[in-house]
């Protein structure tokens, strides 16, 4: 069993890696983002019927999201952050403006509205060493749709 000091040190290290990954995403430094993500990662994203398997598929999904919201930004530092062992949770806000087409999983295309969202955004993540292997993201998709003029 890990001691409190070991657990606290591990949590602090993982929070640093998470911040590094989100700051790299905000800077569109995808080489650094890819170094943080495990090749066999799984991502659970609100609104998707199935999880995303693999870092390449996750990267492709994020690129599609950025085509819809080119100014997408995840705020750091995280106002809420905690963890235990290989798991951490961070809660912050994410913002973006709907200025590019959105392609739904069924192929339907939604034209941009030019409206912005500002949502509480959280992620619970599991780490394998220094690589993120599970992401469970959470945010209010109904509120996002309302803010974007889609509901």
Could you describe each region identified by the protein language model?
Residues 2-151:
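C-terminal and inter-domain tail/linker signature
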């Amino acid at each position: 069993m890990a001691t409190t000091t070991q657990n606290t040190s591990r949590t602090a290290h993982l929070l640093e890696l998470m911040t590094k990954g989100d700051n790299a995403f905000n800077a569109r430094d995808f080489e650094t983002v890819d170094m943080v993500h495990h090749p066999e990662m799984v991502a659970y994203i609100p609104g998707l019927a199935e999880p995303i398997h693999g870092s390449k598929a996750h990267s492709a999904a994020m690129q599609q999201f950025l085509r819809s919201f080119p100014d997408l930004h995840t705020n750091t530092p995280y106002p809420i952050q905690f963890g235990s062992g290989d798991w951490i949770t961070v809660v912050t806000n994410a913002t973006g403006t709907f200025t590019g087409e959105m392609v739904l999983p069924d192929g339907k295309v939604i034209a941009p509205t030019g409206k912005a969202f500002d949502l509480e955004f959280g992620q619970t993540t599991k780490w394998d060493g220094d690589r993120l292997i599970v992401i469970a993201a959470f945010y209010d998709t109904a509120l996002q749709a309302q803010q974007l003029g889609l509901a």
